[in-house]
């Protein structure tokens, strides 16, 4: 398959205004070597008219016959892409104009890499720069330097378990090297994090560039915000780390197992959310979050 071409598979359910901005950021790419597929999972806002309005033959539209759910739509996106490189471009995010060239260059420098990622600029609903404490923590945890970042083996997974510093929406996948099964429908939030750990458990390599190439949007109606408010996000992170601990124990990755058992970054995030709930006088959330932060267990 052509390694100088990338497919942007765009799973879509709702948020037509954000989708329009996402597609415009595609049109604005400095490197024109891309294709795009919008996969409409039968949400409330049909996207066909918006997609066709761009009048660009590189952008195609598929409306699923039934709602496939998050994992199902993501796996379909991977399966119908015709190129070796595929980015699951979230429909409420935007690309910096350099993303295509940046990621193609990265993946072609590392021919054996299963996936590649870049740095992110976090934006708000209107596209302005957004500051948040969890994002600042990621900046502290992530590897430093100006060279490409190579993540592999026990050491690589240990760094991700200590703090999930890769912004998974930026990941571009090399289809031919992906683990079998794709994204697991067992998850609603940690699908891509789970896939990165399976890549590393299987001996694969993930590479990254310290250059910013993506704009990740935080807003009140996106999946992350909704699952954070319902605590499903934290329960999944705890369950995921329990799974990583079990798998690490089986193959003798003791340092990963110990870190997964401690769940430090998740517990700190729970305590941070508990403090926010106290400030907001959101009494129904305070105790579950506090107990989760202290004991590393949470029931949604």
Question: Can you name each region flagged by the protein language model?
Answer:
Residues 32, 40-49, 66:
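A conserved acidic beta->alpha catalytic loop
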Residues 98-138:
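Conserved donor NDP-sugar-binding/catalytic core segment of glycosyltransferases
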Residues 47, 64-81:
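Glycine-rich, basic loop-to-helix element that forms the pyrophosphate-binding segment
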Residues 201, 211-220, 225-253, 289, ...:
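Catalytic core of nucleotide-sugar-dependent glycosyltransferases
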Residues 86:
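Short aromatic/hydrophobic "clamp" motif used to bind/position activated sugar donors
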Residues 45-53, 94, 98:
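Acidic helix N-cap motif at the loop->helix transition within catalytic regions
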Residues 137, 142-230:
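Conserved nucleotide-sugar donor-binding catalytic segment
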Residues 24-33:
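Short, acidic, metal-binding catalytic loop of nucleotide-sugar glycosyltransferases
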